[in-house]
């Protein structure tokens, strides 16, 4: 006898929780696969679940039990109101990074500016900026060719005209004069490995997560490279780790003594943004 949707989902959720996993993950994956919102779920939850859907759910459940990220299972993640393709070559976009995008947009109008996003990954930052500011010239750089392939797919799917470059830091565009530098670079130190969720440690690309010199290496590189490229009134927007505020304040102040350096907190009250304006 076929089981009803809510019975299967309740069982799956409880099973995950009994294994110490996030029970809601299976609900999220199921609703995304069905294309249902919460209202549609309430309308259909008492209906019988077809056998093939139950088999798919059990396959997804087995993956979630190994800490495989739900976003990789689905091949997509939501960011700043848009759906982005993701895979194991890209970091999964985080809600905290939306605050970086929001802060940059709030401070800069839709006038012709040259904007460079370093370590673009899925292209989430670059694409979100371009869609919100069509007059900006947005350049996106990544060291991973596989990540750039995904970023290009996202830009095309969402209709964002981005210039993409493969390379290290700002080197691919060293001759440019830029108005805005924005980056969410690898900033986790090896000592912080134990703080990461198992799903992040196991499946997300380590080159997009970890950096040498207590997680500061990429900031040091970008700040150094930007000094010959950033226009006199140019601005810098970095996402940072929660323990890096003081270090970024010092690095940016030393390189740009004429600018106002701000360390701003995220919605959780942790240092999250380093800004030079």
From Swiss-Prot:
Its EC number is 2.1.1.297. Gene3D superfamilies: DNA helicase RuvA subunit, C-terminal domain, Vaccinia Virus protein VP39. One of its GO terms (molecular function) is protein-glutamine N-methyltransferase activity. SUPFAM superfamilies: S-adenosyl-L-methionine-dependent methyltransferases. GO terms for biological process: methylation. CDD domains: AdoMet_MTases. PANTHER family: HEMK METHYLTRANSFERASE, MTRF1L RELEASE FACTOR GLUTAMINE METHYLTRANSFERASE. Methylates the class 1 translation termination release factors RF1/PrfA and RF2/PrfB on the glutamine residue of the universally conserved GGQ motif. This is Release factor glutamine methyltransferase. It comes from Enterococcus faecalis (strain ATCC 700802 / V583).
